[in-house]
A protein has these predicted regions:
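Short amphipathic alpha-helix adjacent to the substrate-entry channel of hydrolases
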Residues: 1-17, 23, 180-181
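Residue in the alpha/beta-hydrolase core beta-strand immediately N-terminal to the catalytic nucleophile
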Residues: 69-71, 135-137
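Conserved alpha/beta-hydrolase "acid-adjacent" motif
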Residues: 147, 168-175
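Catalytic histidine neighborhood in serine/cysteine hydrolases
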Residues: 183-191
């Protein structure tokens, strides 16, 4: 619905399907065919998927699409992806502090965030960030531990966080409202 609306107003829109965190992956989890919500590598692959997509668009549609002035919108895990592309980096200290408490936490998004500790390599911001991204809208993002205050405060782009009051996976207070206060960019909005 959002992609159609933006396209109807003249925006070029791309809606990627991330195989490791798609509806098919969730269905496999619910049917007992997978043991994780998503493979840990998806925390790295999703931002890289977007960078790859922008590269392909630049190669094939450079006369029609300005890929040097891109806005990214993502929901839940996609919100994480959008913020990683904007320059938020995985905060290993925050994850090491929070994830041992996973079994007693009521924050279901930590199930995904704490998967980062299973990634076998250390990833730096430059690998996930994309300078072509100029603004971000993150809807119900999961950010509290994987980015934390230190990382979110480094984003310099305009950011809009959209929060819902009834999201059982990414609860509003710890995942959007408090993290909104960590943003230091001049252009920040909480909806």
């Amino acid at each position: 619905y959002l992609a159609k609306h933006l396209a109807s107003h003249g925006f070029a829109v791309a809606v990627p399907e991330h195989p490791g965190s798609s509806a098919k992956q969730i269905e496999a989890l619910l049917n007992g065919l997978e043991s994780d919500v998503t493979p840990p590598q998806e925390l790295i692959d999703r931002p890289l998927d977007i960078k790859f997509l922008l590269d392909r668009i630049a190669d094939n549609f450079s006369n029609q699409v300005n890929v040097d002035n891109v806005g990214v919108i993502g929901q839940s895990f996609g919100g994480y992806t959008a913020l990683a592309l904007a320059g938020a980096e995985i905060n290993w200290n925050s994850l090491n502090r929070d994830c041992p408490n996973l079994e007693t936490s009521w924050n279901l998004s930590w199930l995904i965030q704490c998967l980062a500790l299973q990634i076998p390599l250390v990833v730096n911001k430059e690998e996930l960030q994309d300078e072509r991204i100029k603004a971000v809208i993150a809807i119900n993002p999961l950010v509290s531990s994987i980015f934390g205050k230190e990382s979110l405060s480094k984003i310099k782009l305009p950011v809009m966080l959209i929060s819902g009051s009834s999201d059982p996976v990414t609860p509003a207070l710890p995942e959007q409202i408090i993290p909104f206060t960590w943003l230091t960019t001049r252009e920040k909005y909480l909806v």
